[in-house]
Amino acid sequence: MSEGESKSTHFGYKTVEADKKAELVAGVFHSVAAKYDIMNDVMSFGIHRFWKRYTIEVSGARPGMKVLDLAGGTGDLTAKFSHLVGDKGEVVLADINDSMLKVGRTKLRDKGIVNNVSYVQANAEALPFPDNHFDIITIAFGLRNVTDKDAALRSMNRVLKPGGKLLVLEFSKPQHEIMRKVYDLYSFKVLPKMGELITKDADSYEYLAESIRMHPDQDTLKQMMVDAGFEQVDYTNMTDGIVALHRGYKF
């Protein structure tokens, strides 16, 4: 790349300048933040709760641990982690989008979850935390929105303690052809109409469908985690691979 030539990346199926993607993604989540939880239930038929519950089970969170819920949005995982780590533990709900953080903070405070949770507006590519700080890091349905995923994974590795675990819960690639066809039909024909009906914003849900297709598949993401310094990396497909949970350790 010649000097002065800007880097490009994808925003859904569109090619955009890399330094513009974060702003475009922010616009999506500013738009949908208020109805984000409702849409999660509707568009996944509630199955996202199972995916997240499995993530919590795999995490091995225990009293006294420090947990980073990155791209934590409205705080579903944070709420569960708060109970598991107890008064001597700490959960940081971090998100780059202040609208999502506000919704998450309000929701958790309404549930009485206040003592061991803090909120940080942070870019996953340059996390504002000390080295070797967290026992567990989760990023659920957030990595595909990050401009430089490799930089984000390296940043997560840096702030994770030796012996710590990273869990990446993300949309991925269905494993069977019939599921791929049904999923494509649902994603591109039904999902935007749901978005228009519930949030008055079909475009954001068109972006969602496109961003999922542009996200690395299961094995590619596994290798990206290895390249970022994680060890014993593996993944579990859920709902035929519509979603995958990747796990890796720092030693």
From Swiss-Prot:
| Enzyme class name | transferase
Q: Which BP terms does GO give this entry?
A: aerobic respiration; menaquinone biosynthetic process; methylation
GO molecular function terms attached to this record: 2-methoxy-6-polyprenyl-1,4-benzoquinol methyltransferase activity; demethylmenaquinone methyltransferase activity
Keyword list, A-Z:
Menaquinone biosynthesis, Methyltransferase, S-adenosyl-L-methionine, Transferase, Ubiquinone biosynthesis
**EC number(s) stated in the UniProt entry for this protein:** 2.1.1.163, 2.1.1.201
The domain of life for this entry's organism is Bacteria
Q: Entry's HAMAP family?
A: MenG_UbiE_methyltr
Q: Which family does it belong to?
A: Belongs to the class I-like SAM-binding methyltransferase superfamily. MenG/UbiE family.
UniProt protein name: Ubiquinone/menaquinone biosynthesis C-methyltransferase UbiE
Name the species this protein comes from: Shewanella baltica (strain OS155 / ATCC BAA-1091)
